[in-house]
Structure formats: C-alpha cells, structure tokens
C-alpha cells in the first residue's frame, strides 16, 4: 500500500511540535534548556509584566492603544503554562490517535480521512500560521511608522529608552522579538484544540463506517462479525479516553481563551474606531481583530462537529445487520449502545461548552464591553 494513502494522524501534528521545539520546551538539541529558560523568563513572564507596568500613569489614549496586546500577552502566557503542564496528556492523546489510525480497514475509510479531516486540519494549521505572520509583520511596521521615537507598545524599562538611538533600538527590538515569540506561543496554544477536534471527529466517522458495515458481508461468519463489534467497542473506549484527556487538557486553557477573546475583541473595536493614528495602525488592529476571531471560531465549530459525530453512533449501530446475528452479538451490541448514550461535550472551566453557542456568547459579551466603553466616552 502507498504510504501516502495510509491514515497518519501524527503527520498533522508535526508543525505543532515544531512550535514547542522552537520555544525550547521539546526536542533534543544543544542549549535547549538554555533557550527554554531564556524564553520562559524574559518573554513568557517578564514581557507581560513590563507591558502592565508600562501603562502606569499614562494617558488614557495610550493605555487603550496598548491594552489589547497587553491583555493578549497576559492570557497567552497563562495558556502557555496550562498547555505546557498538560504535554504528557497531549502525547497520550496522540498515541491513542495512532492506535485508531491502525484500525482503518477499507479504501473508503482512507479516502474519507485523507480528503476531509486530514485536509481540513492542514488548512487550519496553515491559517493559524498565516494569521500569526501577518500579525508580526503589521505590528512591527506599525511601530516603525509611528510618529516620534516611540516603542511598539507601552512598556516599562529600568532606564530611559529614549536616551540614545542605540538604547532605543535595543528596547524596540526586545518588544519586536518578544511579541513575535509570544505569537509563536499562541500558535502552540490555539492550533491544538481545533485540529484535535477535527481529527477525533474523523475517527468517530470512521468508527461509524465500520459499525454500519457489520453483518452485511455474507462472506464473514457470525463469530467474525462479533469480533468486529468487540473491536468497535474497544475503539469507542479509546475515543472516550481521548475525550476525558481533552477535558483535562482544555479545562483551564480554553476558559482563558474565551475571556481573552471577549475582552480583546471589544478593545480592538474601540481602537479601530477611535485610536488608530495611521493606515498601518488601522491595518494592524484589523488583522488583530481577525486573529481574535480565528483563535476562537475553529475550536467552537469543530467542538460542536465532534459532538454531532458522537451523536450519530447509535444510528450506526442499528445500521448493522443485527437482526440476523446471534445472542452473543446482540448482547455486545446492547453494551455498546449504552456506552454511546453518554453525552460527549467538553467544557472550558467545567462551565462553558466549547461549541458555537459559546462563540456567539463571547461575541455578545464583546459587544457588551464595547457599548459599556462607549457610554464612558466624553
């Protein structure tokens, strides 16, 4: 069989693990621990702190121009630590997905996975990367074209960054590099949930295909059909284990994602309407606004899609030729039927379901923040 036609979920995560290697968290290369310590200390922790301190006693207009990015950096660091804490579980999920890859039986299943979940997951990965690169470029250009010798964002330094040209450019470079690395961290944070939801949805659909075919091949004996059903039960158990691990992995990180998106969408809208000082700044805020929606929408969409695929499992069970099966098969079928009746959903913080209703609720929350801010406008 052509290896390119095989179902290989691990290939969809190569870019994801590349982000962690670039950040010094994963991989085996010289000075990895030094890279990890440097980025964690001076970027993940100190960069948001220097942004927060930089807003102290500054004019309101300057605070608003930097507030969206300060908030995003703060939540980015929070999500980064949440995901880093759960990397062991993420690797376990990937191992279970590889086990499910090996269960693919027919050309129909391979074609479906490669043309649907695999293609969509690659598109999502590329979309996040394009959005990140666009944000880095527009932020840097907007900073370079701002009037006067100003930094990209309000920030505190233990010296006068305007003292000399060299000191200014060192400070500017720190913000440019720091913001770029935090955007790289955000790629690792935000790309994982929708890609995994998409891959899991694909494997649920493949299980549906396998279950619905049982009993329709006259060449197979009753014992062979029963074995296929038991294998389907084992596949379902692995899928439910993945769901349990995803609940643990995304419990806190996605709650931060919802809060971050709601707050930053509203702040960015205000900046676009009232505080953008030139076309480059307007473009940057517009790209940032789009990035906020891109961060949130795929997770919610593929979260509800995954739930809908699980809801189809009972119908797949009764699509098999169960009426002509023996008692052993039907007993196993009843067991699987009871297992598939368990609701499958993942909630951020155990409160907010990761689905489209949560996406629209977040957008409504952002609009509420926006109207509240307008009411304080003089």
UniProtKB/Swiss-Prot annotation:
Superkingdom to which the source organism belongs: Eukaryota
One Pfam family it belongs to: 7tm_6
KW Cell membrane (keyword) present: yes
GO BP annotations listed: detection of chemical stimulus involved in sensory perception of smell; sensory perception of smell; signal transduction
Record's bilayer topology term: Multi-pass membrane protein
Keyword tags: Cell membrane, Membrane, Olfaction, Receptor, Sensory transduction, Transducer, Transmembrane, Transmembrane helix
Regions of this protein lying in the Cytoplasmic compartment: 1-33, 84-127, 185-254, 307-355
Entry GO MF terms: ionotropic olfactory receptor activity; odorant binding; olfactory receptor activity
GO cellular component: dendrite membrane; membrane; plasma membrane
Extracellular compartment residues: 55-62, 149-163, 276-285, 377-378
Transmembrane region(s): 34-54, 63-83, 128-148, 164-184, 255-275, 286-306, 356-376
InterPro entries: 7tm6_olfct_rcpt (IPR004117)
Subcellular location: Cell membrane
Tissue/organ expression: Expressed in 1-2 cells on the distal edge of the antenna but not the maxillary palp.
Subunit structure: Interacts with Orco. Complexes exist early in the endomembrane system in olfactory sensory neurons (OSNs), coupling these complexes to the conserved ciliary trafficking pathway.
Leftover remarks: The atypical heteromeric and topological design of the odorant receptors appears to be an insect-specific solution for odor recognition, making the OR/Orco complex an attractive target for the development of highly selective insect repellents to disrupt olfactory-mediated host-seeking behaviors of insect disease vectors. Odor-evoked OR currents are independent of known G-protein-coupled second messenger pathways.
Similarity field: Belongs to the insect chemoreceptor superfamily. Heteromeric odorant receptor channel (TC 1.A.69) family. Or2a subfamily.
Entry function: Odorant receptor which mediates acceptance or avoidance behavior, depending on its substrates. The odorant receptor repertoire encodes a large collection of odor stimuli that vary widely in identity, intensity, and duration. May form a complex with Orco to form odorant-sensing units, providing sensitive and prolonged odorant signaling and calcium permeability.
PANTHER family documented for this protein: ODORANT RECEPTOR (PTHR21137), ODORANT RECEPTOR 19A-RELATED (PTHR21137:SF35)
Protein name: Odorant receptor 33a
Gene name of the encoded protein: Or33a
């Amino acid at each position: 069989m052509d290896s390119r036609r095989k179902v290989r979920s691990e290939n969809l995560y190569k870019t994801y693990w590349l982000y962690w290697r670039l950040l010094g968290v994963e991989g085996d290369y010289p000075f990895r621990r030094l890279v990890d310590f440097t980025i964690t200390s001076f970027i993940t922790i100190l960069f948001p702190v220097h942004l927060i301190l930089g807003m102290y006693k500054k004019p309101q207009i300057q605070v608003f121009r930097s507030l969206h990015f300060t908030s995003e950096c703060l939540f980015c660091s929070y999500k980064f630590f949440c995901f880093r804490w759960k990397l062991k579980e993420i690797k376990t999920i990937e191992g279970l997905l590889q086990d499910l890859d090996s269960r693919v039986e027919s050309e129909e299943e391979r074609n479906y996975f490669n043309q649907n979940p695999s293609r969509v997951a690659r598109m999502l990965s590329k979309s996040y990367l394009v959005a990140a690169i666009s944000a880095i470029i527009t932020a840097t250009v907007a900073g370079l074209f701002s009037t006067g010798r100003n930094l990209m964002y309000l920030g505190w330094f233990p010296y006068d960054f305007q003292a000399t040209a060299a000191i200014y450019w060192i400070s500017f470079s720190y913000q440019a590099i720091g913001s770029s690395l935090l955007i790289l961290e955000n790629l690792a944070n935000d790309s994982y949930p929708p890609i995994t939801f998409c891959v899991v949805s694909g494997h649920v659909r493949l299980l549906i295909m396998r279950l619905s075919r049982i009993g329709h091949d006259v060449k197979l004996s009753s014992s062979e059909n029963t074995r296929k059903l038991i294998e389907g039960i084992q596949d379902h158990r692995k899928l439910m284990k993945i769901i349990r691990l995803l609940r643990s992995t995304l419990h806190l990180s996605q709650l931060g994602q919802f809060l971050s998106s709601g707050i930053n969408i509203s702040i960015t809208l205000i900046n676009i309407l009232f505080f953008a000082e030139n076309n480059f700044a307007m473009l940057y805020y517009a790209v940032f606004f789009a990035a906020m929606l891109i961060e949130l929408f795929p997770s919610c969409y593929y979260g509800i899609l995954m739930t809908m695929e699980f809801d189809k499992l009972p119908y797949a069970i009764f699509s098999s030729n169960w009426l002509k099966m023996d008692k052993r098969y039907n007993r196993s079928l009843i067991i699987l039927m009871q297992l598939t009746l368990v609701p499958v959903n993942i909630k951020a913080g155990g409160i907010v379901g990761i689905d489209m209703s949560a996406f629209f609720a977040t957008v409504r929350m952002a609009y509420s923040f926006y109207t509240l801010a307008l009411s304080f406008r003089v």
